[in-house]
């Protein structure tokens, strides 16, 4: 899976239930 800050296409690409979003290409991040 993708770590925080890594590129992703969907939320399922990210580790630990992190979200996938971004304006300049999606990356994984921890929701607040």
Swiss-Prot record:
Q: What is this protein called?
A: Pi-phymatoxin-Pcf1a
Q: Which cysteines are joined by disulfide bonds?
A: 1-15, 8-20, 14-28
The molecular function terms of the Gene Ontology recorded here are: ion channel regulator activity; toxin activity
Q: What else is known?
A: Negative results: has no effect on voltage-gated sodium channels. Not toxic to crabs when administered by in vivo injection (2mg/kg crab).
Keywords of the record, alphabetical order, are: Disulfide bond, Ion channel impairing toxin, Nematocyst, Neurotoxin, Proton-gated sodium channel impairing toxin, Secreted, Toxin
Native organism: Phymanthus crucifer
Transmembrane stretches in the record are: none
Query: What highest taxon heads this organism's lineage?
Result: Eukaryota
């Amino acid at each position: 899976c993708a770590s925080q800050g890594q590129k992703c296409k969907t939320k399922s690409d990210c580790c630990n239930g992190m979200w996938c979003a971004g304006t300049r290409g999606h990356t994984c991040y921890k929701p607040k």
